[in-house]
Swiss-Prot record:
It comes from Mesorhizobium japonicum (strain LMG 29417 / CECT 9101 / MAFF 303099) (Mesorhizobium loti (strain MAFF 303099)). InterPro entries: DadA, FAD-dep_OxRdtase, FAD/NAD-bd_sf. Belongs to the DadA oxidoreductase family. Oxidative deamination of D-amino acids. SUPFAM superfamilies: FAD-linked reductases, C-terminal domain, FAD/NAD(P)-binding domain. It catalyses: a D-alpha-amino acid + A + H2O = a 2-oxocarboxylate + AH2 + NH4(+). One of its GO terms (biological process) is D-alanine catabolic process. It is an enzyme of class 1 (oxidoreductase). Its cofactor is FAD. Its EC number is 1.4.99.-. FAD binds at residues 4-18. It comes from the Bacteria. This is D-amino acid dehydrogenase 3.
Amino acid sequence: MPKIVVIGAGIAGVSTAYALLEQGYDVTVVERRRYAAMETSFANGGQLSASNAEVWNHWSTVLKGIKWMLRRDAPLLMNPTPSWHKYSWLLEFVSNISRYRENTIETTRLAIAARKHLFEIADREGIDFDHVRRGILHVYWDKDGFDHALKVNEMLNEGGLDRRSVTPSEFAGIEPALHGKFYGGFYTPSDSTGDIHKYCAGLEKACTKRGAQFIYDAAVTRIERRDRFNIVCATDGADQTLVADGIVVCAGTNSRDIAAMFGDRINIYPVKGYSITVELDGAAADSSAPWVSILDDRAKIVTSRLGAARLRVAGTAEFNGVNFDIREDRIRPLVDWTRMMFPKVATEHVVPWAGLRPMMPNMMPRVGKSRVPGVFYNTGHGHLGWTLSAATSAMLATVVATDLPIDARLAA
């Protein structure tokens, strides 16, 4: 059977490996970190959120970015230091504003399809990932924010999502722990949350049982094409060369550099997000911390309940290149917001984290073929990697099956 090497063991890479195994391929996954899901997929917001499918390509996003440029605690922060990569990405971002509606609807449809795939995989493989299926509540503080959400809701509905408007008086019935003087909100009962790292680890085990090999601490440094691909990886000690019939690039923010080895331009920019994981204490946590996931549109902050003992709070977007620094002035707003929205939640024990979202300028993942035969991409999912990966991986596996059919290789 054809041998496929998947580069990257985050949510996109592990999901791709699983989809290819389902097709019958011999799969090896190469990851530069020591374990699966140690970068973008380690401690993100935890939402499986079709309701968050609105792409960012809108003039309001541009205006907010300019307005907030001098605020170190702003939800959207842009480092003004000149960078050709950053500015070229921003120009492409603006050029895709005309596709805002079309891409939002398509993302919604993709997210709904992905949900079905992911739930089926988790059930089939018995993956425990602190899954909570209580929906997502979007909250808005003023009329302008709510009116924009009404327009977004039309697109989400056209994409097939049931997201209904709710009044502040209805909030208590949805999530009693929530505090605030809101204008209105939208509730999506079909959305859910969970621990993406636990899901990836469980899916990695499922892939291993199905015959996949995972090679860690192995950074791809060179790829050569002879009769087959020779993939050279730097490991502890001597370099290791893998031979493959096909390659799938799922390398997150590193995908841009890998793509350049094939002469492809994948204009991914690393957009940093932050999170805190609040360690909940005692039986009172059940009533003080939310079980329903919250998305505060003004603050750009989300919550996910990860079992009885943890609450994930995440958000913000920072354009600052490849930078994993955890800044106190970016973590502090998450802690302050948690105290404001859930005053009975103790925040003495929080674990901060920062990760880089692999963002394409059009906010759509790159799924499909390279200009080089036998090379494929499933990358650039941005802030919706977990929400979309199960569907894009199934799509990619179908493309691979067309280009590298198993029967043809066996016949050869």
